[in-house]
Curated annotation (Swiss-Prot):
NCBIfam families: PRK09284.1, PRK13352.1, thiC
Protein name: Phosphomethylpyrimidine synthase
Statement: the UniProt record of this protein carries the keyword Electron transport: no
Class in the EC hierarchy, top level: lyase
UniProt: Zn(2+) binding residues: H437, H501
Organism: Salmonella agona (strain SL483)
Binding annotation for [4Fe-4S] cluster: C581, C584, C589
């Protein structure tokens, strides 16, 4: 852990340098490949890990090798993972989905922004130095049209986004020929239906049923289509965003790029400080993954942080502002009802959700029902016009294991189920947010309650943390719960960093949180039996048994750390071909001994076989040629 503390000026300068020198970069011994689709000029990016051959015999002077297949893996890094792509943060990413959106002929380009706040920001010359220069002219559904992926799915339309996703979810496993790599244990999926092969039609059917969502705002054409659903790979979200006391636009863009490099499937911008609007624009124009927000945070900033002064009008304007910028999903705390707030009074830690506490305070101060609940249909109308998915927030989630699975938590969950049905009336895609802090033996109930109460809409949880005693290590305490609930059926896991409960995460914290949660998600995919999930594990195990150290590093989720740990004790190049590591040394390496046992057993088998043949030869009288009837 680094102990170097940079000043705010140094942090910003470092982030600016990162942005100015940003290039497409592949992981060690990996290359970017594109798998093409059958329609719409679809090219799905993946990372292919190149492997070295296996020594299978021969002599020192004439060794014999067997080639090992390259291993394709899911890649969230977008253009940032392709060395052939020129990166310019000032211009933003290529608009991958724009031709698909325009070809559907159901959107119109707006003459002006719908949000009064946006119009005000755009005319403020004092913001010119901060503003992203290549602003998009926003689009909206034509009158009488809905432009959501759920709407298309219900019409029986397989969109380019759906085909892109089908190819992506299969992870290029059709390229793998080795039976050793293709071997996979049967999973236990708790009633999920995982197909042998994910087809575009399967994607369409899951979206149409509401069991999966494709967050894909028509004003975020830079994003690469992905899916969140129980019957697909478990996804991971990373949170970034400035606060009133720290971080800048440069640092948040740096964290965005860093997050996609380390496997974030979506990113939430939770900015609460200055220049929220401008920061979000830079993030969206440079993001290859869906971006989510909690609009109530910005609405609160517009009323100077006074929850009691929030109004539906200010919130609605914020929704329009963010939808026209391209936000792909909104967290809306519409389930925090006035009658549920007293249920939290007996809790040890009360209401720990920022959005939940804001709405609870508003409800109590006005003694009125939550205006997000009261205006929920209007929220859905806005979302349907831009294809913004709804992430129904768990404002009453437990903030300690003592408060887990209580009346307040599940009362809100049941309300979220009612709101889900309303959103579906408008063809709006929905996922449900979940806890929180839950001990291991109480986690599965959260999944079963969500499936029953929310009609199998995708579940999206923060952890859950399985114990409260480890500040500084809550990426571990929550990673345990995340792996469990992912196995039980949770579709997306919101990462927790080492700074949880302690401070705003920096770049290294983001990486630590993501690696922890990619492990949890992958462990869940293995346990569920997601097709092809075990290929990378098998490749790693084979490389490990054959002492192919470079391949072990390169197959790792974090090749750099794996290599660094190995080189701490065996830094010489000879250590990377040695048939042992520093833990056991050459005499006690179990895998080296296993290889020797295997070779010895094979030799013994041959020797025994030859002895049997010799005995049989003598029993036949020692004749070289036998009579036909004796054969």
């Amino acid at each position: 852990m680094s102990t170097t503390t940079l000043t705010r000026r140094e942090q910003r300068a470092k982030a600016q340098h990162f942005i100015d020198t940003l290039e497409g970069t592949a992981f060690p011994n990996s290359k970017r490949i594109y798998v093409t689709g059958s329609q719409h000029d679809i090219r799905v990016p993946m990372r292919e890990i190149q492997l070295s051959p296996t020594l299978i015999g021969g002599s020192k002077d004439n060794p014999q090798f067997e080639e090992n297949e390259a291993v394709p893996v899911y890649d969230t890094s977008g253009p940032y993972g392709d060395p052939e792509v020129a990166i310019n943060v000032q211009q933003g990413l290529a608009k991958l989905r724009q031709p698909w959106i325009e070809a559907r002929a159901d959107v119109e380009t707006l003459a002006d922004r719908s949000s009064a706040y946006t119009r005000e920001r755009l005319t403020d010359e004092g913001l010119d130095a901060l503003r992203f220069t290549g602003l998009l002219t926003p689009k909206r559904a034509k009158a009488g049209h809905r432009v959501t992926q759920l709407h298309y799915a219900r019409q029986g339309i397989v969109t380019p986004e759906m085909e892109f996703i089908a190819i992506r979810e299969n992870m290029g496993r059709e390229r793998i020929r080795s039976e050793v790599l293709r071997h996979q244990h049967p999973g236990m999926s708790f009633g999920a239906r995982l197909p042998e092969n994910i087809t575009p039609e399967f994607v369409r059917d899951e979206v149409a049923a509401g069991r999966a969502i494709i967050p894909a705002n028509i004003n975020h054409p830079e994003s690469e289509p992905m899916i969140i659903g129980r019957n697909f790979l478990v996804k991971v979200n990373a949170n970034i965003g400035n606060s009133a006391v720290t971080s800048s636009i440069e640092e948040e863009v740096e964290k965005l790029v860093w997050s996609t490099r380390w496997g974030a499937d979506t990113v939430m911008d939770l900015s609460t400080g200055r220049y929220i609007h401008e920061t979000r624009e830079w993030i969206l124009r440079n993001s290859p993954v869906p971006i989510g927000t909690v609009p109530i945070y910005q609405a609160l900033e517009k009323v100077n942080g006074i929850a009691e002064d929030l109004t539906w009008e200010a919130f609605r304007d914020t929704l329009l502002e963010q939808a026209e910028q391209g936000v792909d999903y909104f967290t809306i705390h519409a389930g925090v009802l006035l009658r549920y707030v007293p249920m939290t009074a007996k809790r040890l830690t009360g209401i720990v959700s920022r959005g939940g506490s804001i709405m609870a305070k508003w409800c109590l101060s006005h003694h009125k029902e939550n205006f997000l609940f009261e205006h929920f249909r209007e929220i859905c109308e806005i979302c349907a016009a831009y294809d913004v998915s709804l992430s129904l927030g768990d404002g009453l989630r437990p903030g300690s294991i003592q408060d887990a699975n209580d009346e307040a938590q599940f009362s809100e969950l049941h309300t979220l189920g009612e709101l889900t049905k309303i959103a579906w009336e408008y063809d709006v895609q929905v996922m449900i947010e979940g806890p929180g802090h839950v001990p291991m033996h109480m986690i599965q109930r959260n999944m079963t309650e969500e499936l029953e109460s929310c009609h199998e809409a995708p579940f999206y949880t923060l952890g859950p943390l399985t114990t409260d005693i480890a500040p500084g290590y809550d990426h571990f305490t929550s990673g345990i719960g995340a792996a469990m609930i992912g196995w039980f059926g949770c579709a997306m896991l919101c990462y927790v960093t080492p700074k949880e409960h302690l401070g705003l995460p920096n770049k290294e914290d983001v990486k630590q949180g993501l690696i922890t949660y990619k492990i949890a998600a992958h462990a869940a995919d293995l346990a569920k039996g997601h097709p092809g999930a075990q290929i990378r594990d098998n490749a790693m195990s084979k490389a490990r048994f054959e002492f192919r150290w470079e391949d072990q590093f390169n197959l790792a989720l974090d090749p750099f750390t794996a290599r660094a740990y190995h080189d701490e004790t065996l830094p010489q190049e000879s250590g990377k071909v040695a048939h042992f590591c520093s833990m056991c040394g050459p005499k006690f390496c179990s895998m080296k001994i296993s290889q020797e046992v295997r070779d010895y057993a094979a030799a013994q088998t041959i020797e025994v076989g030859m002895a049997n043949m010799s005995e049989n030869f003598r029993a036949k009288g020692g004749e070289i040629y036998l009579k036909r009837e004796e054969v």
